[in-house]
Design a protein with these regions (language model features):
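Glycine-rich, basic loop-to-helix element that forms the pyrophosphate-binding segment
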Residues: 1-4
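Active-site acidic short loop of glycosyltransferases
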Residues: 6-9, 99
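Short, high-confidence coil segments that cap the C-terminus of an alpha-helix
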Residues: 8, 36-38, 123
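Conserved catalytic core of nucleotide-sugar-dependent glycosyltransferases
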Residues: 21-102
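C-terminal catalytic/acceptor-binding lobe
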Residues: 75, 81-82, 91, 102-166
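Short beta-strand-to-loop acidic/aromatic patch adjacent to the donor-nucleotide binding site
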Residues: 8-19
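Short, solvent-exposed loop/turn segments at secondary-structure junctions
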Residues: 18-19, 45-48, 94, 131-133, ...
Length: 166
C-alpha cells in the first residue's frame, strides 16, 4: 500500500481529465468525515463533455463558473448517470471491499465494478447534486476504445460482481 494511504482516513480515485466545483469536493468529503457515507461521489452522475473552445476558455480563466454558465452548449458524455470519474472512499471500507479489481483492463470498467461491489456490501453511497465536467482530449493508445473482446470480458466480470454477496 502507498505510504501516503497509511495515515489518511479517506482515499480518492480521480480521473485526470475531469473537473468539478471545489464546493462539491468538500460536500463529498464532509459526508465521509461525518460517517453519513462510506463512498461519496462529488457529482450527481451527470457528466458534460466540454468543447475545444470552451475548454480553452475555461483553462485560461480557471473559473468553474465558465462551465456552469455554458451548460446549454455542452453535450452529455453519456446518456445515463455514471459512477466513475471522481470518487472518495472511506479508506478502511475501501480496503475491506478489496480496493480495485485488477481484472479490469483499460478505463471505465472499474467504475461499475467498484459501485456494484460497494453496494453489494451494503456501503452507504452519497452523491452531491452537481455535474462533473469531462475535458475533451484526443483518444490515443492509453485512452482509446477497446476491442469487443474486452467488452465481453468486462461484461462477464461485471455479471460476476453484480451477483456476488457479502
Amino acid at each position: 500500500m502507498n505510504r501516503l494511504l497509511i495515515n489518511t482516513p479517506i482515499t480518492a480515485n480521480w480521473d485526470s481529465d475531469t473537473n468539478i466545483d471545489k464546493k462539491t469536493i468538500m460536500d463529498a468529503v464532509n459526508a465521509l468525515r461525518s460517517s453519513h457515507a462510506d463512498i461519496a461521489y462529488p457529482y450527481n452522475g451527470i457528466v458534460y463533455q466540454t468543447s475545444d473552445i470552451l475548454q480553452i476558455y475555461y483553462l485560461n480563466t480557471k473559473d468553474i463558473k465558465v462551465l456552469y454558465k455554458n451548460l446549454n452548449k455542452l453535450d452529455f458524455l453519456y446518456n445515463q448517470p455514471i459512477y466513475g470519474g471522481d470518487v472518495f472512499v472511506n479508506k478502511n471500507k475501501y480496503i475491506d471491499a478489496g480496493m480495485e479489481n485488477e481484472r479490469n483492463y483499460g478505463w471505465g470498467n472499474e467504475y461499475y465494478d467498484r459501485y456494484n461491489r460497494f453496494t453489494n456490501l451494503g456501503y452507504n453511497v452519497y452523491r452531491v447534486d452537481a455535474p462533473l465536467f469531462h475535458l475533451c482530449h484526443s483518444r490515443k493508445e492509453n485512452s482509446s476504445f477497446r476491442p469487443k473482446t474486452f467488452h465481453h470480458i468486462f461484461s462477464n466480470e461485471l455479471f460476476r460482481i453484480s451477483n456476488s454477496s457479502k
